[in-house]
Amino acid sequence: MTILNHTLGFPRVGLQRELKKAQESYWAGNSTQEELLTVGRELRARHWQQQKDAGVNLLPVGDFAWYDHVLTTSLMLGNVPARHQNKDGSVDLDTLFRLGRGRAPSGEPAAAAEMTKWFNTNYHYMVPEFVQGQQFKLTWTQLLDEVDEALALGHKVKPVLLGPVTYLWLGKVKGDPFDRLNLLQDILPVYRQVLAELAKRDIEWVQIDEPALALELPAEWLAAFKPAYDALQGQTKLLLTTYFDSIGQNLDTISALPVQGLHVDLVHGKDAITLLNSKVPADWLLSVGVINGRNVWRADLSSWFERLQPLVARRKRLWIGSSCSLLHSPIDLSVETRLDEEVKSWFAFALQKCSELALLSSALNNNDPASLEAWSAPIRSRKHSTRVHNAAVGQRLAAISPQDSLRKNRYPVRAKAQRQRFQLPAWPTTTIGSFPQTTEIRGLRLDFKQGRLDGTHYRTGIAEHIKQAIVEQERLGLDVLVHGEAERNDMVEYFGEHLDGFIFTQNGWVQSYGSRCVKPPVIIGDVSRPEAITVNWAKYAQSLTDKPVKGMLTGPVTILCWSFPREDVSRETIAKQIALALRDEVEDLEKAGIGIIQIDEPALREGLPLHQSDWGAYLEWAVDAFRLNAAVAQDDTQIHTHMCYCEFNDIMDSIAALDADVITIETSRSDMELLESFEEFEYPNEIGPGVYDIHSPNVPSVEWVEALLLKAAQRIPTERLWVNPDCGLKTRGWTETRQALANMVKAAQNLRQAQKA
């Protein structure tokens, strides 16, 4: 038996974020669609060749997306909401961009599709919309075109398709309610057509992704897999692909499916190799994900060699692969020229992970474990590194008591003290934190970072931008202000730069959604705060106005989830280390006179384990970390938190347990649907439902905002409602920001007047 290796997908954006730059240039009207298409072709060709050169046997095709792979699947199926359809019924690249962004260089602007997290990652997908009686047909042949590209270049390819059951699972019903699972029989003919086209191209294996199988699915959804895959049998072999967690709970169903292979994530899953050997049919190809696609740490290949021996001994066909798509990993470690060599030796980015697969498959095929020893040596040396361990942090963690996570009084007492202190009007208006990161701001930070600007001139420049943000907000009539975060490159990276235990890359970019990329810090050791982080800028901003200015912190769970974490200690331990560091920041902000402090936790739900049976333990420590961070605040200090793209109904107990005085949430894309959870739960504290979508450049009208607020007021008492955008305004321009906020403030003022009348 020859063991092949493969990846489940590769980063799309390019080492220098070429795709992002080409997208944004096209959207701004500065380049043509053909120029954008050329960049895409060049990136795909480069990435295929890089994987091949690294020793990957089978190259993924179909992992590239112009915005998001779920959105690509929607277009493939002809699933385009009426508001985005072209008059002639055609589907083109601008159709895709209108769905993702709400507008494109051609076609009429309309509300963008809802966006939410891809399982428990920091990647976002565009939620498919389903209506009763919907028709599907093959209207977007991107996958087939890209397979033709790769074949023309002489590559051995493995097309990648998002599976039909997972696709339906990820979507939402619009209009009259119905069971979207009933649409399965309608989308399967399109899948059959695509598979038939691939068979014509002599494709042997198709990777069909069904990550929903890593969930604890309702019985009717689990039962849907058998008829679905009965219908998809054909000339091509199907590699049913799962990832992000174990599938043991669904393995009996999976093993009865008419497929020829199965991919299992052994990194994040708890599936025992003995269970796989006994349950997965002997004649199936078994592919095991052994290289972590979601982190940056070098794999212990020597350990994997030993762990895989029972499979090598018993399986007729075995592949090794990445645990999931390498989409979630930076591209190339070799360009990181500023990393300390010891620390650098601990890491592997996407290209290095491809090399790891080649090394391990070669060692397995040649029964040569000695060939892996040099690769695994830095992993063992890291265990004893002084960069990793800080005794003082461990002592402080051990001294935590339950009282440390409790505010002095309950919300009703605190609310009274806060009303007396701030004297805010009904329908108080605020923003979520950041203001537009202009070319000038980015240039200022870059010049300072690269040594072209000294600290004094940098701070003077940042102070001017903060002053401008305060002036703009006062002119607009906002009630609670923010300093605008001009000094911050990223809400997680900024804090990581000021905390011990973090390191940073130069080019470690990963895609979050569309053209949005983030450069997560890496947590390499125990976390502590050497000095105050945000206090001076918050204090300066507050000195410019009589209105309250919020202190802005990123919460411990979000910093954890949006960083590449250590793997040698628990996530709970890391979160509580961060919480203790930020607790000191809350205390220092209070001492500086900051009376409203926002602790953002947009990633709280994202951190949930995929198995609902594991939620309780996670939520307990995640909530405790937030409270540990916030509970040092006095009664008249108002603690806000903000959450993104969340379904709240099944975690409302935990949301309430955070005990934040005000929670702001993203609701505009869901037309305030998310507030139903708060209404049914009778959420006791204050809520700011987002009234417009900041991810779209479309400016909401006063009437639009009023309508959403009135809809919110049907569910939440007006005395507990705040008025705010969905999220921070970092990615928007000042012109649209002014227009949108002016309309938002006017809507709040109109409602105040109506309330008095």
From Swiss-Prot:
GO terms for molecular function: 5-methyltetrahydropteroyltriglutamate-homocysteine S-methyltransferase activity; zinc ion binding. The keyword Nucleus does not apply. Catalyzes the transfer of a methyl group from 5-methyltetrahydrofolate to homocysteine resulting in methionine formation. Transmembrane segments: none annotated. Zn(2+) binds at H642, C644, E666, C727. 5-methyltetrahydropteroyltri-L-glutamate binds at R17, E18, L19, K20, K117, R516, C517, W562, E606. PANTHER family: 5-METHYLTETRAHYDROPTEROYLTRIGLUTAMATE--HOMOCYSTEINE METHYLTRANSFERASE. It holds the Pfam family Meth_synt_2. NCBIfam families: met_syn_B12ind, PRK05222.1. Belongs to the vitamin-B12 independent methionine synthase family. The active site is at H695 (proton donor). It catalyses: 5-methyltetrahydropteroyltri-L-glutamate + L-homocysteine = tetrahydropteroyltri-L-glutamate + L-methionine. Binds 1 zinc ion per subunit. Its EC number is 2.1.1.14. Pathway: Amino-acid biosynthesis; L-methionine biosynthesis via de novo pathway; L-methionine from L-homocysteine (MetE route): step 1/1. L-methionine binds at I432, G433, S434, E485, D600. L-homocysteine binds at I432, G433, S434, E485, D600. It comes from Erwinia tasmaniensis (strain DSM 17950 / CFBP 7177 / CIP 109463 / NCPPB 4357 / Et1/99). One of its GO terms (biological process) is methionine biosynthetic process. Keywords: Amino-acid biosynthesis, Metal-binding, Methionine biosynthesis, Methyltransferase, Repeat, Transferase, Zinc. Its cofactor is Zn(2+). This is 5-methyltetrahydropteroyltriglutamate--homocysteine methyltransferase. It comes from the Bacteria.
